[in-house]
Amino acid sequence: MSVNFKGNPVDLKGNVLEVGAKAPKVSLKAKDLSVVEIAKEDKVQIVLTVPSLDTPVCASEAREFNQKIAAFKGAEVIVVSMDLPFAMGRFCSTENIDNLVVASDFVAKEFGEKYGVLIANGALEGLLARAVFVIKDGKIAYKELVKEITEMPNFEAVEEFFKGSGSCCGGCGCH
């Protein structure tokens, strides 16, 4: 699988998980170095992957989801990158990001590898491609892999999913 960075193809390590697949459990580091668990069976999680919060597009994406989080009632929104937890904390403080969780995959790159979004070559090698996963009941309920890393994900599609057209089957306020 590949995506583009500024129009040039870059490969991803592994296979991107598809809707219906079991979501692998992964432990990441929060900005305060606590553990963030991905694929909790008792929560609906919206997981956004970005190369780095220190880039304009990634920062805009985090701000946008931070503002629109009310549309995803009952869901936990988590932004995952390879940024160091300290840098993530500084970003959240500077940008007043307080409605979502930031988590780093820098320790083992386990999320990137298991979810198929780890960039394997090119200028961004070792970072994460831009993607959105909704995890419900331990499975991938929604997925968007953004084909051009420098572009934003489709916010409207995620909102529509939670309004019921893609329906996450309840428990998250989408009905």
PLM features: residue spans?
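Chalcogenol-based redox active-site neighborhoods
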Residues: 1-175
